[in-house]
């Protein structure tokens, strides 16, 4: 075993520290005597909190500075939420392990404990995600969507203070924080697709660091990997980022991998969905096929309009 101190690059939010702390604890349990420490890196997404993500522009808003630290060798690995990781990684970096996925669904959290169907006419829903906003508008065209940025505890506090009637969050974040009791209702992916990679954690490292890759190998979950690979293949096909309402969810049941994908217009008036199933060995092809079906069915026009805006 290595004598190195393994430095994990992480964002500084409570949730990010919980996720990276879980990886640290798992590595230390697997490799007794291994020294692992967390190193907080502030990202662009952490610094700009008063602008919707779609208007900030660019890709990798929550990972770029951590990847820069990896390439500069000031950290040895990085723990990311896979939904934040761009479809194409920087040269010299790879995802070394993807542990077992948490619940990938979105959830509604309301002040009254009532679900989305019971919100008042013109109710105010907080989210900074175009994907979530588009799908909510499809379900409830009367709803007012208001920008909501900040970490998970800030979002919950703003809801409690009355700034919103409801907010939409990732189930995985609430679960990892032990705050399942805050969930009002889970949004079924059959009606409301999550973000690409949502609920999955990716551990990124330098391609030339075989020592760290070996340490991470026992943390890797093959079933989660093939599901996320299919979703990310869809994302690459659509060339999407934070600026576009794209959703995707893949799951493996009895040896069959099924992927559903979605592209919506900003106003939610147009929403295209497609799905394919096949062998896990075809994960990338399934992602490409779903992406091409979406593009050919009308999503290409929507994406071109968004990119021109």
Curated annotation (Swiss-Prot):
The keyword Cytoplasm does not apply. GO terms for molecular function: hydroxymethylbilane synthase activity. PROSITE patterns: PORPHOBILINOGEN_DEAM (PS00533). The keyword Transmembrane helix does not apply. GO terms for biological process: protoporphyrinogen IX biosynthetic process. Keywords: Porphyrin biosynthesis, Transferase. CDD domains: PBP2_EcHMBS_like. Pfam families: Porphobil_deam, Porphobil_deamC. InterPro entries: HemC (IPR000860), Porphobilin_deaminase_cofac_BS (IPR022419), Porphobilin_deaminase_N (IPR022417), Porphobilinogen_deaminase_C (IPR022418), Porphobilinogen_deaminase_C_sf (IPR036803). It catalyses: 4 porphobilinogen + H2O = hydroxymethylbilane + 4 NH4(+). Its EC number is 2.5.1.61. The modification S-(dipyrrolylmethanemethyl)cysteine is found at residue 242. Its cofactor is dipyrromethane. One of its GO terms (cellular component) is cytoplasm. Monomer. Tetrapolymerization of the monopyrrole PBG into the hydroxymethylbilane pre-uroporphyrinogen in several discrete steps. The porphobilinogen subunits are added to the dipyrromethane group. Belongs to the HMBS family. This is Porphobilinogen deaminase. The lineage of its organism: Bacteria, Pseudomonadati, Thermodesulfobacteriota, Syntrophobacteria, Syntrophobacterales.
